[in-house]
């Protein structure tokens, strides 16, 4: 079962929840990065938050280059989860706590995502662990949400460790268990992680790594 219908529904409910509760669209700090998602005027020099809506990509994002580079077939949901939309990260409440689903802000963000998924998968190979790829963060960035590449199930994972708990048998069922979380935009502190400099998806991963390192 594709995760796309569940993702479509969640993104629709997400924006409707903001409109119903706050009377406005969700906002996001783009840190100078343009996106088709932005509603209204955009000033690259401004550090203000922007209102945004998810935008369907004209051409589906593909991970064929990642598969070719690693000689690995990725679980099919990766193309629908990351390749259908341009969007900001979306916040959620769940039976397992609060968290954030990652999305792609623009084409440069998609390129950065691919490179970091390659890095994550190479780390798993080096550690002789089963392949996973990430879809979000849990508990304010303390843990990753990852997909088992062998069967599409969703797990909690701390970088460098084996996944610790299965949350759902599929990405679709995981998304269906979430509800939108209404919160003001947060401007994430820039942290010294050169490999994760792009402000779209990976501001979230900077925060996660910062939290993990700080707790060791």
Curated annotation (Swiss-Prot):
**N-terminal signal peptide:** none
Source organism superkingdom:
Bacteria
Its main localization is membrane
Q: Name one Pfam family in it.
A: Syd
One term under GO cellular component = cytoplasmic side of plasma membrane
Q: How does it sit in the bilayer?
A: Peripheral membrane protein
The answer to keyword Metal-binding applying to this record is no
- Cellular compartment(s): Cell inner membrane
**Keywords annotated in UniProt:** Cell inner membrane, Cell membrane, Membrane
User: What does this protein's UniProt record list under function?
Assistant: Interacts with the SecY protein in vivo. May bind preferentially to an uncomplexed state of SecY, thus functioning either as a chelating agent for excess SecY in the cell or as a regulatory factor that negatively controls the translocase function.
Similarity annotation: Belongs to the Syd family.
HAMAP family hit by this protein: Syd
Entry protein name: Protein Syd
What organism is listed for this UniProt entry? Shewanella sp. (strain MR-4)
């Amino acid at each position: 079962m594709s995760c796309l219908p569940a993702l479509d529904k969640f993104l629709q409910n997400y924006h409707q929840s903001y409109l119903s509760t706050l009377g406005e669209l969700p906002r996001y700090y783009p840190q100078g990065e343009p996106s088709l998602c932005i509603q209204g005027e955009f000033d690259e020099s401004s550090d203000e938050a922007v209102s945004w809506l998810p935008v369907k990509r004209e051409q589906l994002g593909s991970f064929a280059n990642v598969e070719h580079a690693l000689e690995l077939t990725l679980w099919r949901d990766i193309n629908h989860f990351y390749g259908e939309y341009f969007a900001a990260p979306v916040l959620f409440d769940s039976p397992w706590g609060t968290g954030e689903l990652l999305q792609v802000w623009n084409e440069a963000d998609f390129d950065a995502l691919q490179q970091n998924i390659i890095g994550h998968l190479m780390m798993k190979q080096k550690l002789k662990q089963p392949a996973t790829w990430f879809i979000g963060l849990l508990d304010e960035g303390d843990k990753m949400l990852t997909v088992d590449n062998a069967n599409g199930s969703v797990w909690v994972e701390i970088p460098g460790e084996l996944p610790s708990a299965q949350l759902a048998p599929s990405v679709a069922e995981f998304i269906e268990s979430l509800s939108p979380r209404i919160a003001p935009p947060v401007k994430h502190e820039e942290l010294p992680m050169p490999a994760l400099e792009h402000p779209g998806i990976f501001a979230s991963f900077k925060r996660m790594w910062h939290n993990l390192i700080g707790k060791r």
